[in-house]
Structure formats: structure tokens, C-alpha cells
């Protein structure tokens, strides 16, 4: 499984950390009290495609597999100081979840909790995916009329967001998983 956490301390130092052992319980191998991952499944085990071209994500010594993990820290363009931290679990849809949350905060004016809870959507180029039960029939029909296949599916993000509003930090935890927001006064 994959987890994400966002943290800010009293000095404004920010962390966005996404960690994964791939599938539930990873490789199911315990070493020194922790589970080893099975991230090798992120590689393409075929070195060449049907046309004989090398696949970029093929297994090679010293190489890391491609990943969709996208822990994100947003910096204020004027001061260069961190003003937001966010990320999510969710496999190949992580980038969609983070992009949706950033757009929700910056352009739709949502607060951190609203952005984390907003309906999920994404595209692979061949299909458009909408979070099941979150988009009405006219919206789905309008998207389908534009060409790509539209599929309603479960999109269980787990987005965690911290964003600075004035001199305070606001948090949001995705209700689709067991995330939470906590604050401590020094």
C-alpha cells in the first residue's frame, strides 16, 4: 500500500512525503521489523514492444521503475517560502488527484478539505474516468460526446493537504480513506 503525509512545523518547514510498498503488505517479507516493497512490479518485464523498440521502463541494473508518486510542495513565487504541501496514494491516478487538488485550491477557491473531497476524474488518453456517483448524467454525456470513452469507476484517492492562509495553516484529509488532520500549539 501507499501512504502520504504532509507536515509543517512552527518555523514553516514543510514536508510532503509519499511512501509505498506497492501492494498490500508489499513483498510480504519482514526485515528488521518492516516490510520490504515489491516495487519491481512497476517495471515492464518485456524489454521491447511489438515493433521491436526498447521499452523505456524495462528492467535494467541500477534503474528505478517509473512511478506516479507526486509529493508536492508549493512555493510562494515572491518569497520562495513553502505555502502548501500535498500528495496522495492511488497508483497511476496519483498525478490526477494531486493536479485536481492544486487546481481546486488555486482556481476554484476551495479550502483544503473541500479540495481533498472534490470529485476525482482523469484521463489516460484512451478513456476519461469519472469517480462513480459524483458526476451527473448530463456531464457524463457531454464528455462522451467529445470522443473518448467515459467510464464511471471507483477512484479512491487519499489526498492530504496543508495550505497556508494568512498566518495560519489549514488542513484537509480525503474522506475516501482513513486520513486525518491534526494541529498542535507550541
Regions found by a protein language model. Name each.
Residues 135-186:
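Cofactor-centric catalytic regions
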Residues 1-153:
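Proteins synthesized as precursors that undergo proteolytic processing into mature forms
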Amino acid at each position: 500500500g501507499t501512504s502520504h503525509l504532509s507536515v509543517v512545523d512552527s518555523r514553516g518547514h514543510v514536508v510532503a512525503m509519499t511512501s509505498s510498498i506497492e501492494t498490500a503488505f508489499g513483498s510480504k517479507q519482514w526485515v528488521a521489523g518492516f516490510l520490504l516493497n515489491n516495487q519491481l512490479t512497476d517495471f515492464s518485464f518485456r524489454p521491447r514492444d511489438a515493433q521491436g523498440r526498447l521499452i523505456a521502463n524495462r528492467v535494467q541494473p541500477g534503474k528505478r521503475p517509473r512511478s506516479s508518486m507526486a509529493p508536492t510542495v508549493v512555493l510562494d513565487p515572491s518569497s520562495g517560502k513553502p505555502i502548501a504541501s500535498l500528495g496522495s496514494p492511488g497508483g497511476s491516478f496519483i498525478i490526477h488527484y494531486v493536479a485536481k487538488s492544486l487546481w481546486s485550491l488555486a482556481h476554484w477557491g476551495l479550502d483544503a478539505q473541500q479540495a481533498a473531497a472534490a470529485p476525482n476524474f482523469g484521463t489516460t488518453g484512451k478513456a476519461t474516468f469519472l469517480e462513480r456517483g459524483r458526476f451527473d448524467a448530463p456531464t457524463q454525456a457531454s464528455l462522451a460526446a467529445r470522443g473518448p470513452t467515459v467510464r464511471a469507476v471507483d477512484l479512491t484517492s487519499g489526498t492530504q493537504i496543508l495550505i497556508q492562509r494568512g498566518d495560519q495553516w489549514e488542513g484537509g484529509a480525503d474522506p475516501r480513506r482513513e486520513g486525518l488532520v491534526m494541529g498542535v500549539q507550541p
